Amino acid sequence: MFLGTYTPRLDEKSRLILPAKFREELAEGLVLTRGQERCIYVFSAREFERVHEQMRSAPLSSRQARDYIRVFLSGASDEVPDKQGRVTVPAPLRQYAGLDRDVTVIGAGTRVEIWDSESWNTYLAEQEAAFSETDEDVLPGVF
């Protein structure tokens, strides 16, 4: 499970050093793709296979499903981290997420998300205001 918030920087070759706690699960390979709210989703190769299998069950007769799957998969890039735990973030994904050098990497359970740090801080400030009031509405019975 991926947890926590980290603030690495992209190097001059657009490589991201993965947080040490994430490296073991991602060492065999990972997939980066477009995420919601203009972030990049990072899945382990195994988890991405599971996500893809769920997508395959979507009805091809649904234009909305086809459109989503096209955008999601066409932006995907499979990568293998190097021995130092670095992974290159492809230019189209950097552009999509507005990444420069300062990034925020968050653990989101089954995936990692890479955010432009300023965008993450803005998003978090907007969401924290309502956070304590929404737990029962969004996740009934969890807390």
From Swiss-Prot:
<dbReference type="GO" id="GO:0005737">
    <property type="term" value="C:cytoplasm"/>
</dbReference>
<dbReference type="InterPro" id="IPR007159">
    <property type="entry name" value="SpoVT-AbrB_dom"/>
</dbReference>
<comment type="subunit">
    <text>Forms oligomers.</text>
</comment>
<dbReference type="Pfam" id="PF02381">
    <property type="entry name" value="MraZ"/>
</dbReference>
<comment type="similarity">
    <text>Belongs to the MraZ family.</text>
</comment>
<protein>
    <recommendedName>
        <fullName>Transcriptional regulator MraZ</fullName>
    </recommendedName>
</protein>
<dbReference type="GO" id="GO:2000143">
    <property type="term" value="P:negative regulation of DNA-templated transcription initiation"/>
</dbReference>
<feature type="domain" description="SpoVT-AbrB 1">
    <location>
        <begin position="5"/>
        <end position="47"/>
    </location>
</feature>
<dbReference type="InterPro" id="IPR038619">
    <property type="entry name" value="MraZ_sf"/>
</dbReference>
<keyword id="KW-0238">DNA-binding</keyword>
<dbReference type="InterPro" id="IPR003444">
    <property type="entry name" value="MraZ"/>
</dbReference>
<keyword id="KW-0677">Repeat</keyword>
<keyword id="KW-0963">Cytoplasm</keyword>
<dbReference type="GO" id="GO:0009295">
    <property type="term" value="C:nucleoid"/>
</dbReference>
<dbReference type="InterPro" id="IPR020603">
    <property type="entry name" value="MraZ_dom"/>
</dbReference>
<feature type="domain" description="SpoVT-AbrB 2">
    <location>
        <begin position="76"/>
        <end position="119"/>
    </location>
</feature>
<dbReference type="InterPro" id="IPR035644">
    <property type="entry name" value="MraZ_C"/>
</dbReference>
<dbReference type="GO" id="GO:0003700">
    <property type="term" value="F:DNA-binding transcription factor activity"/>
</dbReference>
<dbReference type="InterPro" id="IPR035642">
    <property type="entry name" value="MraZ_N"/>
</dbReference>
<dbReference type="GO" id="GO:0000976">
    <property type="term" value="F:transcription cis-regulatory region binding"/>
</dbReference>
<keyword id="KW-0805">Transcription regulation</keyword>
<dbReference type="InterPro" id="IPR037914">
    <property type="entry name" value="SpoVT-AbrB_sf"/>
</dbReference>
<keyword id="KW-0804">Transcription</keyword>
